Amino acid sequence: MTRTKICGITRLNDALHASSEGVDALGFNFSRKSPRSITPSAAKKIIDELPPFVSKVGIFVEQSPAEIADICSYSKIAVAQLHSERYSAADARFLKDMVHVIRVFRPDGSFSPQSLTPFAEESGVRTFLFDAYKEGMEGGTGEEIETSVARQIFPAEGAPFFRVLAGGLNPGNVAEAIRQFRPYGVDTASGVEAKPGIKDPEKISAFLLAVRLANQP
């Protein structure tokens, strides 16, 4: 079953609705530049009300590893998503002693999936999220990964590591993306929104239903 993550949560009602519809993980964006930015205290208030079996993921772009550790501890974040090229394998290894870590890559045409292995060996990270590349932009882009690039990242079989697909996914295209690439998980933010930071409950339900149907034989 393809795992699901809805990112850019800023409101309790959105988080509770997604949880009731069976989402696997919720993302809280701590990047100060994001239109979906949330403070650690606001995230904590939401997380305190959520069911225990929904993973709480923090998205980080500007913060140092020490700041990330502090935010995760305070807000009860269980997974740190390192959404910037600035984070090294050493940074990821430092954080892995405290939380699970997802390292994000934004592959362009020159990206080699073979580069994952040395990063994994040095950092201990086993989960990688792939978002669309857009020059000069960090964090989520809301655009789809080019098909030719995605095919390299998500080979037909035998791929090591947990590989998560992000970038431009919505209720209308997520099922085809799952059938085509068979990722471990799918991640969306803008694809289920009414406007940045405000989720549309009908789109959330439709997205999660599309994922379930795509996994049926």
From Swiss-Prot:
Molecular function as annotated in GO: phosphoribosylanthranilate isomerase activity
Domain of life (superkingdom): Bacteria
Pathway where it operates: Amino-acid biosynthesis; L-tryptophan biosynthesis; L-tryptophan from chorismate: step 3/5
A biological-process GO annotation: L-tryptophan biosynthetic process
Reaction catalyzed: N-(5-phospho-beta-D-ribosyl)anthranilate = 1-(2-carboxyphenylamino)-1-deoxy-D-ribulose 5-phosphate
EC assignment: 5.3.1.24
UniProtKB keywords: Amino-acid biosynthesis, Aromatic amino acid biosynthesis, Isomerase, Tryptophan biosynthesis
Statement: the UniProt record of this protein carries the keyword Cell membrane: no
Classification via SUPFAM superfamilies: Ribulose-phoshate binding barrel
InterPro entries linked to this entry: Aldolase_TIM, PRAI_dom, RibuloseP-bd_barrel, TrpF_fam
HAMAP family with a match to the protein in the record: PRAI (MF_00135)
Family stated for the protein in its record: Belongs to the TrpF family.
PANTHER family (UniProt xref): N-(5'-PHOSPHORIBOSYL)ANTHRANILATE ISOMERASE
Descriptive protein name: N-(5'-phosphoribosyl)anthranilate isomerase
Source organism (scientific name): Chlorobium phaeovibrioides (strain DSM 265 / 1930)
